[in-house]
């Protein structure tokens, strides 16, 4: 099955839209197929501001209206406790809310941007999607992340080379309760460090501070900019370390 065939069979759908590579291409494909695809962005403290800005920018490029739904995820104790299956509880909250809003707008089909490169396995987040009957056209059509990037480039989407970005909650070690302060520190640190030229990196919280993880090609940059990194992160964290084991590229 191709995406065009999928949207011919399913001409109306709500889309969980993050503004990332996958959901951006899925929205573009729906628009190109003449389908009515309504993108919904659920704004929680787990997402940095630039994600919403990218989502709006992409929708403006495609001349599609974006619906933003605010959610204070800190009202969900099963999420902020940060258990190993946090992602399951979080996605279930998000998609339950989204399904209700989409239904009130007249949409019975809910889509997300999971692709064929994502390992479904027993990942907690995938379980939530199955339970709530969320369909993943990119995965169903066999489109891998690499292929989606290439098709996005051909389509002229600015998201084609956007690094994958996991939610800010992943910066907090499992078992450590998530706080707004921790998320704000991680987001601020990553936002400022990106201005130094870092891409596809993480500022992860540790017991006494933070650990900077970069890809192999950026380790030398991290060492060269050590003083700048300390200037940026010292006001936020008492202890700062650099992981000398290179971070795997997101894709």
Language-model region placement:
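Flexible, glycine/charged-enriched surface loops at secondary-structure junctions
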Residues: 199-204, 239-243
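Short proline/glycine- and acidic-rich turn/helix-capping motifs at secondary-structure junctions
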Residues: 241-251
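Short, conserved charged micro-motifs
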Residues: 218-225
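Short, aliphatic-rich beta-strand segments
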Residues: 203-216
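Mid-to-C-terminal catalytic subdomains of enzymes
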Residues: 139-145, 149-193, 197-202
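ATP-dependent adenylation/nucleotidyltransferase module used to activate substrates
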Residues: 1-154, 195, 210, 228-237, ...
């Amino acid at each position: 099955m191709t995406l065009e065939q999928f949207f011919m069979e399913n001409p109306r759908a709500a889309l969980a839209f993050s503004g990332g590579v996958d959901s951006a291409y899925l929205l573009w494909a729906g628009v190109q197929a003449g389908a009515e695809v309504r993108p919904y962005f659920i704004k929680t403290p787990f997402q940095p501001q630039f994600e919403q800005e990218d989502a709006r920018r992409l929708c403006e490029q495609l001349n599609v209206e974006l619906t933003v739904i605010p959610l204070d995820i800190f009202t969900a104790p099963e999420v902020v406790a940060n258990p190993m299956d946090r992602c399951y509880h979080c996605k279930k909250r998000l998609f339950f809310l989204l399904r209700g809003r989409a239904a009130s707008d007249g949409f019975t089909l809910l889509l997300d941007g999971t692709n064929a490169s994502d390992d479904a396995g027993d990942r907690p987040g995938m379980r939530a999607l199955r339970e709530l009957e969320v369909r993943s056209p990119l995965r169903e059509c066999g489109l891998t992340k690499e292929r989606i990037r290439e098709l996005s480039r051909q389509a002229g989407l600015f998201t084609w080379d956007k690094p994958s970005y996991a939610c800010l909650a992943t910066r907090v070690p499992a078992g450590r309760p998530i706080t707004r302060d921790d998320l704000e520190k991680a987001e601020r640190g990553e936002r400022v460090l990106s201005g130094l030229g870092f891409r596809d990196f993480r500022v992860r919280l540790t017991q006494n501070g933070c650990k900077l993880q970069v890809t192999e090609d950026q380790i030398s940059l991290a060492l060269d900019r050590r003083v700048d990194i300390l200037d940026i992160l010292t006001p936020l964290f008492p202890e700062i370390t650099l992981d000398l084991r290179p971070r795997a590229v997101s894709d």
